[in-house]
């Protein structure tokens, strides 16, 4: 589609659960001239009554100038070695702030990032879900009614449209997916429906919007998965820097944040995975007991904004470093367990956290 940066999307239907599929994409001016092929593979989710082990990986903070390999980003090489069932990018996939001042330049950011060898090789072999945050929507801490001259000709509406052009998506940018008997994940939208960060906090201030919040609570309560995981572009638990006012762990959104943490705490075997923060952590909310895993940024060069000696009561693990998070849900002596492992960019395990289903 020339109006969508020459991207093409099509829906696959009738796929069987728990099945490995091979894909061949053919492209070129014609079959006789410039014809090329690209092969890939992916696995579909197991059926809801299948207790098959599932592993997925997560990252955030993928800024092009901070890549750590001539071929792109090292984490994609290491994640591929784990042969994950699926991958989630929680947002900050790329950064419009400095160089994406027009829609054409924003599209160019997608083109150059997803032409990197490590990303092409990884995504040819792993099913992926993409979420957006502020930097691939417009700029740092963006909201729909933000007025800014900083981004030139680029607008919030442009960011929403370009994101949907560049990544595969269903009917909404918030959705839930069941991966077998023991896992269901919720991927939420944190930019489209939010109030201005500068608005006074209270019952009317929101990040998710009323419709998404109602959907989230309803679908979580309907789920009988052994483990339920909220995957959020931004923190729900934190802790975060005191001057931040963009997420549910900040005082600026304390009302909705408290309601969300209270709801999650009322659910058995539910945890949070988040992106956005430039450091890895495992934290437990001191009021409600909600557990949160921050994936940390894609590279060591991107890590920062906190220090390893600033350990708070919430922290079970803290490391200002790049890498990724891998989550496995499997059975141990017939009982469901969740294992969350933080990795460095070199593929070394930095921390392991294990939870048995209650």
Region spans (language model):
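Metal-dependent phosphoester/phosphodiester hydrolase catalytic core
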Residues: 1-358
């Amino acid at each position: 589609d020339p109006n969508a940066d020459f991207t093409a999307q099509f829906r696959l239907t009738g796929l069987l659960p728990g099945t490995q599929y091979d894909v061949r994409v053919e492209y070129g001016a014609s079959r006789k001239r410039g014809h090329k092929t690209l092969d890939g593979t992916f696995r579909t989710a197991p059926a809801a009554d299948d207790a098959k082990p599932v592993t997925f990986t997560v990252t955030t903070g993928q800024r092009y100038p901070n890549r750590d390999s001539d071929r792109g980003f090292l984490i994609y090489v290491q994640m591929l070695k784990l042969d994950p069932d699926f991958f989630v990018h929680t947002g900050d996939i790329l950064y419009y702030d400095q160089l994406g001042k027009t829609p054409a330049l924003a599209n160019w950011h997608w083109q150059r990032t997803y032409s990197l060898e490590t990303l092409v090789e990884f995504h040819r072999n792993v099913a992926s879900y993409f979420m957006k945050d502020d930097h691939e929507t417009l700029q740092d801490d963006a909201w729909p009614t933000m007025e800014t001259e900083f981004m030139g000709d680029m607008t919030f509406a442009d960011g929403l449209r370009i994101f949907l052009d560049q990544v595969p998506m269903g009917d909404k940018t918030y959705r839930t997916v069941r991966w077998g008997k023991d896992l269901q994940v919720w991927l939420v939208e944190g930019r489209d429906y939010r109030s201005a960060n500068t608005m006074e906090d209270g019952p009317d201030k929101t990040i998710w919007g009323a419709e998404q919040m109602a959907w989230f609570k309803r679908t979580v309560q309907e789920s009988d998965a052994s483990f339920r995981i909220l995957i959020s572009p931004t923190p729900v638990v934190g802790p975060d820097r005191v001057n931040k006012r963009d997420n549910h762990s900040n005082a600026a959104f304390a009302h909705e944040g408290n309601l969300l943490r209270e709801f999650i705490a009322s659910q058995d075997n539910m945890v949070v995975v988040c992106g956005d923060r430039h450091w890895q952590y495992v934290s437990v909310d001191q009021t409600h007991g909600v557990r949160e895993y921050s994936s940390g940024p894609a590279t060591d060069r991107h890590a920062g904004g906190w220090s390893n000696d600033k350990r708070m009561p919430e922290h079970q693990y803290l490391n200002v470093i790049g890498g990724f998070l891998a989550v496995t849900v499997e059975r141990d002596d017939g009982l469901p367990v969740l294992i969350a492992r933080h990795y460095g960019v070199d593929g070394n395990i930095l921390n392991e956290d294990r939870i048995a289903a209650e």
